[in-house]
């Protein structure tokens, strides 16, 4: 049962409604103070979540964004984990939240340096069909997972098994790696040793996470699931082939953790007040030129993982409606309203036209997408939002009237309530709206 205004939910999931980079980390951090457990269920270091607190700015790629405030964090079996990259994140979090209990799936697959190299080599082969990969080795790791040749977290305290699996992986990908440093056996053995040394440090955190999560749930713990990326990067429901390699929708809570989606009380979809994207692929409402640079600079739109400038565009309601339906969200959290409001004129895509005729769906084949003509509605910018508007809950009447108009317009078009807005980097600038 969904509880009004999200109060008292025993379980909830946070998922992205666009191309990732929506601000899920900030929303998760805001919510995590009310939850005992935060669980990640997909992706790896290709995710980048930034959290700003009184203690400083923290960027997470593997640990959930709620790690600073909650009691338990879980890395589920649907993730792919770089054990070498994970250790520094744990060390940082321990300084802020020393009592945090960390549980890592024994069955999660391991990202290696060799996978990163394969990622680079595969992108070269794609040539004109490049997808703009983050080169974090995520796709190749999932490839090895489904080829049944991958290394799992449970393997990484066994040096002989690591070496054996690395050699199998090398033979599988030798055509790509022949002219790289990994053609050298000594380099592969050095990589195996590095994984093993990290594995020794992480072994104590390993568990069957599907059992651990169910146990915590049975003990009455409140659980928050944190997704990575967004609907339009999902390989089944996004703009294929410009997608990631793990499923990103809310149903992935089940496949990535073993926890039934029927037990999730609330699904919160996160969207920016505009749209941003890293990498290649379709972007129907993309803004270019000076206005794009202005919006990018106002919003600090540079990738947490890659540092690349993000592409930016107007809020796309056909995409948002589609994502809300696929994720079956109960409410929407809107981020970066402070950034968008600084523009004199704000546009929203209300409708797609193809060959001059309206359509009521989001095409996902490249030839049709190229024909999309967005139809826009325009709003006046609402300017700077007062610093006095902060705290966990506010009345909608405290917001600028032009922003309220924008929020209500989106709610009317999409048919879901906007329950949370974020209007700045600081933790206290994310608020629940009381209407």
UniProtKB/Swiss-Prot annotation:
Which Gene Ontology BP annotations are present? 'de novo' AMP biosynthetic process; IMP metabolic process
Q: Which PROSITE patterns does the record cross-reference, listed alphabetically?
A: ADENYLOSUCCIN_SYN_1, ADENYLOSUCCIN_SYN_2
Q: Which reaction does it catalyse?
A: IMP + L-aspartate + GTP = N(6)-(1,2-dicarboxyethyl)-AMP + GDP + phosphate + 2 H(+)
Reading the lineage from the top rank, the first entry is Archaea
Residues binding Mg(2+) are 21, 48
This entry's Gene Ontology molecular function terms read:
adenylosuccinate synthase activity; GTP binding; magnesium ion binding
Is Magnesium among the key words of this record? yes
Keyword Metal-binding among record annotations: yes
Give the matching Pfam families: Adenylsucc_synt
InterPro entries cross-referenced by the UniProt entry: Adenylosuccin_syn_GTP-bd (IPR018220), Adenylosuccin_syn_Lys_AS (IPR033128), Adenylosuccinate_synth_dom1 (IPR042109), Adenylosuccinate_synth_dom2 (IPR042110), Adenylosuccinate_synth_dom3 (IPR042111), Adenylosuccinate_synthetase (IPR001114), P-loop_NTPase (IPR027417)
EC numbers for this chain: 6.3.4.4
Catalytic residues per the record?
A: 21 (proton acceptor), 49 (proton donor)
Q: Where in the cell is it found?
A: Cytoplasm
Query: What is the cofactor note?
Result: Binds 1 Mg(2+) ion per subunit.
Quaternary structure per UniProt? Homodimer.
Q: Name the family the entry cites.
A: Belongs to the adenylosuccinate synthetase family.
Write the protein's name.
Answer: Adenylosuccinate synthetase
> Organism, per UniProt?
Thermoplasma acidophilum (strain ATCC 25905 / DSM 1728 / JCM 9062 / NBRC 15155 / AMRC-C165)
Instruction: Supply the gene name.
Output: purA
């Amino acid at each position: 049962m969904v509880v009004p205004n999200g109060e008292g939910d025993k379980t909830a999931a946070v998922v992205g409604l666009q191309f990732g980079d929506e601000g899920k980390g900030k929303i998760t951090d805001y919510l995590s103070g009310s939850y005992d457990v935060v669980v990640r269920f997909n992706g790896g270091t290709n995710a980048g979540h930034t959290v700003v607190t009184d203690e400083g700015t923290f960027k997470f790629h593997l640990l959930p964004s709620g790690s600073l405030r909650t009691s338990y964090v879980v890395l589920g079996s649907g993730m792919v984990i770089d054990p070498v990259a994970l250790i520094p994140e744990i060390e940082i979090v321990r300084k802020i939240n020393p009592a945090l209990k960390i549980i890592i799936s024994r069955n999660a697959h391991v990202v290696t340096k060799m996978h990163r190299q394969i990622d680079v080599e595969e992108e070269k082969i794609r040539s004109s069909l490049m997808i703009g990969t983050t080169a974090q080795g995520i796709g190749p790791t999932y490839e090895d997972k489904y080829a049944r040749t991958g290394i799992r977290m449970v393997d990484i305290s066994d040096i002989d098994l690591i070496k054996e699996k690395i050699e199998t992986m090398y033979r599988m990908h030798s055509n790509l790696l022949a002219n790289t440093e990994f053609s050298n056996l000594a380099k592969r053995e050095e990589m195996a040793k590095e994984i093993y040394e990290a594995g020794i440090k992480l072994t104590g955190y390993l568990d069957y996470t599907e059992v651990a999560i169910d146990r915590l749930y049975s003990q009455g713990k409140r659980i928050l699931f944190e997704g990575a990326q967004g609907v339009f990067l999902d390989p089944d429901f996004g703009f294929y082939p410009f997608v990631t390699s793990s499923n990103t929708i809310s149903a992935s809570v089940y496949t990535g953790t073993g926890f039934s989606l029927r037990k999730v009380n609330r699904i919160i979809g996160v969207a920016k007040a505009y749209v941003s994207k890293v990498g290649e692929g379709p972007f129907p409402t993309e803004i270019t030129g000076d206005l794009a640079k202005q919006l990018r600079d106002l919003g600090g739109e540079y990738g947490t993982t890659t540092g690349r400038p993000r592409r930016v565009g107007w809020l796309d309601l056909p995409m948002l409606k589609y994502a809300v339906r696929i994720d079956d969200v109960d409410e929407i959290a809107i981020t970066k309203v402070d950034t968008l409001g600084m523009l004199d004129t704000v546009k929203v895509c209300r409708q797609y036209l193809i060959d001059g005729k309206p359509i009521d769906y989001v095409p996902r084949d490249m030839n049709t997408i190229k024909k999309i003509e967005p139809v826009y509605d325009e709003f006046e910018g609402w300017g700077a939002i007062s610093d006095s508007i902060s705290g966990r809950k506010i009345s909608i009447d405290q917001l600028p009237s032009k922003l309220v108009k924008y929020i209500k317009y989106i709610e009317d078009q999409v048919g879901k309530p906007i329950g949370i807005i974020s209007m700045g980097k600081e933790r206290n600038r994310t608020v629940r709206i009381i209407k």
